[in-house]
Regions:
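Class I S-adenosyl-L-methionine
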Residues: 3-14, 21-168
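Short, hydrophobic/glycine-enriched beta-strand segments
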Residues: 14-16, 179
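Short connector loops/turns at beta-strand edges and beta->alpha or beta->beta junctions
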Residues: 20-22, 182-183
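C-terminal target-recognition/interaction regions appended to catalytic cores
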Residues: 128-227
Length: 227
């Protein structure tokens, strides 16, 4: 990433990437931009300055919002603004995209010269209406006591136990937690130890979340091109 000046000068439509989260995570030392890994956030912006794509997508942990009192994140957004990008950001949680894990991440979407289009990607019109509880069917009841609702089954997930306690998860289960196809981190014809597979999946993006963002960009871009 730091060698981007050596990359070919080819036009691109979308720059998509994330930078190391350890500098911003509340579980780390939180050195922010003082950490070389955290400073890669600005390198991402420099890549945008070189290629000037129409769209940018950047990701990190929610801790980036409060790192150094929010000044680190503000520096990044200010850089995008100076480059001519309108932008929007939102915290998205993978559990609401069809995978069984809570994984909250900050996503920044930038659109060259147009913040409204960037916001339209991350914020659907329906999202401003809030969520309401599902309605029960209408019914006429006698004005007296009615029985409380009850379940005839236990819908809680059971524990998976081994002889010595709760077992560890497998790379296959991690692939499914992240929305990858089964065996995606296996290298055909090569030995694939579990540890590198865990690291790769832990540093990756949740597939359904990225797919949703990509589809939203496609929809908004189609509208822009039709004008």
């Amino acid at each position: 990433m730091t060698k981007f000046q050596e990359w070919p000068d080819e036009p691109i439509d979308l720059l998509c990437g994330g930078t190391p989260c350890q500098s911003f995570s509340v579980a780390g030392l939180r050195k922010g931009l003082d950490d070389p890994r955290g400073n890669l956030m600005l390198t991402f912006g420099a890549i945008g300055a070189k290629y000037r794509p129409k769209w940018l997508v950047w990701e990190n942990v929610p801790g980036v919002l409060s790192s150094n009192g929010g000044r680190d994140f503000g520096t990044f957004l200010g850089m995008l603004g100076q480059l001519g990008y309108g932008f929007a950001y939102r915290v998205l949680d993978a559990q609401y995209f069809g995978v069984p894990q809570r994984r909250r991440r900050v996503f920044v979407v930038g659109c060259l010269g147009d913040w409204r289009s960037a916001a339209a990607v991350l914020f659907e019109q329906e999202s401003f209406k809030g969520d309401s509880s599902a309605r029960w069917g209408s019914r006429t009841v006698h004005p007296c006591l009615t029985a409380k609702g009850a379940r005839a089954f236990d819908d809680r997930t059971g524990y998976v136990l081994e002889e010595q306690g709760i077992r560890t998860t497998t790379p296959l289960e991690h692939e499914r937690l992240m929305g990858f196809p089964d065996g995606y981190t296996l290298l055909p014809g090569k030995r694939s130890p579990d540890t590198p597979r865990f690291h790769a999946l832990g540093n990756s993006w949740c597939v359904p979340v990225v797919r949703w963002i990509g589809e939203r960009i496609e929809q908004v871009n189609r509208i822009l091109e039709s004008r």
